[in-house]
Amino acid sequence: MNTPSQAQVRRAIAEAQTIVVKVGSSSLTEPSGHLDPQRLNALVAAIARVRLMGGRVVLVSSGAIAAGFGTLGFDKRPTDVADQQACAAVGQGLLMAQYEAAFARYGLRVGQILITVSDTIAPQQYRNVRRTLDRLLDLGAVPIINENDSLASNEIRFGDNDRLSALIANIVVADALVLLTDVDALYTAPPSEPGSKRISYVPNVEDALAKVQVGGTGSNVGTGGMVTKMEAARVAAVSGIPAVLTCASNAGPAMMGDPVGTAFAPINDRGSSRRLWIGFASHPQGTLVADSGAAKAVRGGAASLLAAGVVEVKGDFAAGDAVWVDDEQGNHLAKGLVGFDSEEIPQMLGRNTAQLKRFLGEEYAHPLVHRDNLVLV
Ligand SMILES: Nc1ncnc2c1ncn2[C@@H]1O[C@H](COP(=O)(O)OP(=O)(O)O)[C@@H](O)[C@H]1O
Ligand SMILES: N[C@@H](CCC(=O)OP(=O)(O)O)C(=O)O
């Protein structure tokens, strides 16, 4: 695809039918661990304007922990996971109450969806998330999403909402992703560093990643810093979705396509949201080792992984889990959702479809990983 000009990217954002807006903790809360209703209301006003003009907006909002820790008597964001989970349980309610009241002033309803990684990699939950989001949007509501911090385990969690927002943009087939934070744009280095320069347009985020010096959070409530925002912009770009990054007070102009913040061009045509989800969100639970013929077929991009071409299975997983597909040298070729439990697979290895049917029955005469569930890495 040809690289679009900045004006084209800004126009695409202005014309977006479906927009995912992600807002960070520092844009909604006080450092003392309480909500800042004024800033939250200003954000809601900008989103409501787009919504009332007919746009479909999904809001991915951080801020549960940051809104809850002051209320629970902590003087700074706790580091203990159980404390954070308790703060999130309190703060999430406060956050939603505030959003509910703020959107109601414009006659708009909100719907809360809390997501954990483990919920969303299973095909059925993925479909449920997608269906609920689509229905909320069809009904004119504004879905508000956060990670389910009170339930997420420390080992498997998004941890930041930046990447989650890019995955949500895929799920709802968004036309634009708007990342709102406490800095007005991406800079060539963390803005605290002397000489860092504002970047208004990134035609290729993968090239930019090599050139820009990105750092962690600048506030005491944010988590991901610019690293995860760049990753979100990259996921959006490779998914064919233009993105803009700016401060929350620029939300309105950013969604109108005004030249604020940093615009990121898409670098691919749109992909299948399901495949992107597998590629970005899933955590492989095991490995299928492909022989050289199967490795070549998988690398070609259009083939399913058949039992006949698999020489080894590693790990303990259930049908529907994500697995790595490796070559015999141990290189990762692809990630996929496997169709069988790990203990069923050894008896299937090396057998073609006719043999699987004859020896094991009809239900085994299927690929280990169907090509629709396979994503090259
Ligand atoms: N190259 C960079 N350009 C802009 N900001 C950067 C850069 N590197 C690091 N940062 C920091 O990232 C911070 C935003 O991330 P974070 O604090 O996690 O915000 P949020 O709570 O909105 O997710 C900025 O305040 C800034 O200090
Ligand atoms: N899910 C957490 C926030 C995680 C997060 O991404 O925070 P931030 O870096 O402020 O966007 C919460 O609501 O407190």
Curated annotation (Swiss-Prot):
Record GO biological process: L-proline biosynthetic process
Domain PUA: 285-359
SUPFAM superfamilies xrefs: Carbamate kinase-like (SSF53633), PUA domain-like (SSF88697)
Subcellular location as annotated: Cytoplasm
Keyword Transferase: yes
GO molecular function: ATP binding; glutamate 5-kinase activity; RNA binding
Keywords: Amino-acid biosynthesis, ATP-binding, Cytoplasm, Kinase, Nucleotide-binding, Proline biosynthesis, Transferase
EC primary class: transferase
Reactions mediated catalytically: L-glutamate + ATP = L-glutamyl 5-phosphate + ADP
The organism's place on the tree of life at top rank: Bacteria
Binding site for ATP: 22, 181-182, 223-229
PROSITE patterns: GLUTAMATE_5_KINASE, PUA
Functional pathway: Amino-acid biosynthesis; L-proline biosynthesis; L-glutamate 5-semialdehyde from L-glutamate: step 1/2
UniProt-listed Pfam families: AA_kinase (PF00696), PUA (PF01472)
InterPro entries: AceGlu_kinase-like_sf, Asp/Glu/Uridylate_kinase, G5K_ProB, Glu/AcGlu_kinase, Glu_5kinase, Glu_5kinase/COase_Synthase, Glutamate_5-kinase_CS, PUA
EC number(s) reported in the record: 2.7.2.11
GO annotation, cellular component aspect: cytosol
Function noted in UniProt: Catalyzes the transfer of a phosphate group to glutamate to form L-glutamate 5-phosphate.
Family: Belongs to the glutamate 5-kinase family.
HAMAP family in the record: ProB
Protein name: Glutamate 5-kinase
Lineage of the organism: Bacteria, Bacillati, Actinomycetota, Actinomycetes, Bifidobacteriales
